[in-house]
Amino acid sequence: MKILTIIGARPQFIKASVVSKAIIEQQTLSEIIVHTGQHFDANMSEIFFEQLGIPKPDYQLDIHGGTHGQMTGRMLMEIEDVILKEKPHRVLVYGDTNSTLAGALAASKLHVPIAHIEAGLRSFNMRMPEEINRILTDQVSDILFCPTRVAIDNLKNEGFERKAAKIVNVGDVMQDSALFFAQRATSPIGLASQDGFILATLHRAENTDDPVRLTSIVEALNEIQINVAPVVLPLHPRTRGVIERLGLKLEVQVIDPVGYLEMIWLLQRSGLVLTDSGGVQKEAFFFGKPCVTMRDQTEWVELVTCGANVLVGAARDMIVESARTSLGKTIQDDGQLYGGGQASSRIAEYLAKL
């Protein structure tokens, strides 16, 4: 069976790397990889693929920039051309990006079956572009590979049991990736802090595009640096520019954006993770670190339920107090919430039996 995999963001490459390895092990499966170009940066170079052992894409569409509609529309057109040329038996998409939706829509309109990895996730916040993407992708997919029990419950609540789609609980491929690459972790350049620091990330538009929320978060980070523990903040130039334009000053240790292997290194040595990233919430759990999430909702409600994650929004006092009480807390994956690192093999084995 020929599988056409659509990816466009760096996290999707990292997830796809372990699934592609599992697909190769199945003699009845072959894979064509399409990179839409949604996340365009220097780190998506040949060195990036070699460092992580990620298969190089068969197609590079180089589509990035513009509005959500412009980007998705251009992707839809070019992915359709690839599907018509390659004639795959199935299209495989990951997560909730514009690349995900474009790949799913292109396949659906050409009547090619779709498998969605990370299906069933919901933040219940329709202002998030990702929420729209994941809901629409689930609707047109016929195999829904869910990472958690909560994701399956979400699909059941939306009536998917009455549809022809197959719902499969495989676990989370992000855990597979984290465990696989943990031994390759490398330290970032210019880090001055000792182990036990607080690792912070800040990039989500709901925080960086809202001056009130961003000001509150910056003030909280500065207070934590002074009164709780040293804070290490890998920061994208765009976010740094927004902070400077608001006249705010960060007192924490700001470092340049880091790659995946450097991020794992930081996670392994931190005492707490403070983030607004969906993926980093889980990665903190994979490495046994408590997490404080600066968002009003999360797709990973099971982490809040089990006490590994605290949702605090952007309120300064809540961020500071939660950081103080969570720092150094022991987190154990007793229940194997995310499949224990076997999701990719389960996905490949399921596809091979079709």
Curated annotation (Swiss-Prot):
GO terms for biological process: cell wall organization; O antigen biosynthetic process; polysaccharide biosynthetic process. Keywords: Cell wall biogenesis/degradation, Isomerase, Lipopolysaccharide biosynthesis. It comes from the Bacteria. Pfam families: Epimerase_2. Coiled coil: none annotated. The keyword Cell wall biogenesis/degradation applies. CDD domains: GTB_UDP-GlcNAc_2-Epimerase. Transmembrane segments: none annotated. InterPro entries: UDP_GlcNAc_Epimerase_2_dom, WecB-like. Optimum temperature is 30-37 degrees Celsius. It is an enzyme of class 5 (isomerase). GO terms for molecular function: UDP-glucuronate 4-epimerase activity; UDP-N-acetylglucosamine 2-epimerase activity. Optimum pH is 6.0. Plays a role in the biosynthesis of B-band O antigen for serotype O5. Catalyzes the epimerization of UDP-2,3-diacetamido-2,3-dideoxy-alpha-D-glucuronic acid (UDP-alpha-D-GlcNAc3NAcA) to UDP-2,3-diacetamido-2,3-dideoxy-alpha-D-mannuronic acid (UDP-alpha-D-ManNAc3NAcA). Exhibits high specificity towards the substrate as UDP-alpha-D-GlcNAc, UDP-alpha-D-GlcNAcA (UDP-2-acetamido-2-deoxy-alpha-D-glucuronic acid) and UDP-alpha-D-GlcNAc3NAc (UDP-2,3-diacetamido-2,3-dideoxy-alpha-D-glucose) cannot act as substrates. Belongs to the UDP-N-acetylglucosamine 2-epimerase family. This is UDP-2,3-diacetamido-2,3-dideoxy-D-glucuronate 2-epimerase. It comes from Pseudomonas aeruginosa (strain ATCC 15692 / DSM 22644 / CIP 104116 / JCM 14847 / LMG 12228 / 1C / PRS 101 / PAO1). The lineage of its organism: Bacteria, Pseudomonadati, Pseudomonadota, Gammaproteobacteria, Pseudomonadales.
